[in-house]
């Protein structure tokens, strides 16, 4: 059974920082690109960050709205992906999900700024 479990959300003041984590199981994590997406009433579903494989030197890509503020990383030995979020803004509020190329999804973690 594939599982993705996010954690680390909560309430933070504007300008603050927060780190989200996602632990995966049930598939070979190191073989999958990983993404963070978020959902809010205002913007709907919004892709925010992607990290590729070791063979791609863990290349990362970001939505313009978070570039320079958010950093995605992964630890294949722990089947985990992370999202460090700095200088948070009200518009970053939403449920944040980790996903493997949109095939598998976690339950999400709510970030409120």
UniProtKB/Swiss-Prot annotation:
GO cellular component, one term: extracellular region
Domain of life (superkingdom): Eukaryota
Alphabetical GO biological process terms: immunoglobulin mediated immune response
Signal peptide annotation: none
Chain segments annotated as coiled-coil in the UniProt record: none
Keywords, sorted A to Z: Adaptive immunity, Disulfide bond, Immunity, Immunoglobulin
Family matches, as PROSITE patterns: IG_LIKE
Span of domain Ig-like: 1-113
Disulfide bridge map: 22-98
An example Gene Ontology molecular-function term: antigen binding
Extra remark: This chain was isolated from a myeloma protein that binds inulin.
UniProt name for this protein: Ig heavy chain V-III region E109
Organism in which the protein naturally occurs: Mus musculus
């Amino acid at each position: 059974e594939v599982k993705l479990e996010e954690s680390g959300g909560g309430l933070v003041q504007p300008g603050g920082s927060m780190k989200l984590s996602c632990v995966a199981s049930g598939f070979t994590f190191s073989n999958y690109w990983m993404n963070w997406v978020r959902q809010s009433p205002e913007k709907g579903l919004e892709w925010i960050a992607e990290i590729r494989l070791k063979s791609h030197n863990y290349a990362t890509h970001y939505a313009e709205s978070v570039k320079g503020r958010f950093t995605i990383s992964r630890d294949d030995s722990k089947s985990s992906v992370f999202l460090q979020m700095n200088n948070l803004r009200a518009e970053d509020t939403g449920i944040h999900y980790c996903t493997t190329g949109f095939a598998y999804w976690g339950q999400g973690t709510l970030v409120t700024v």
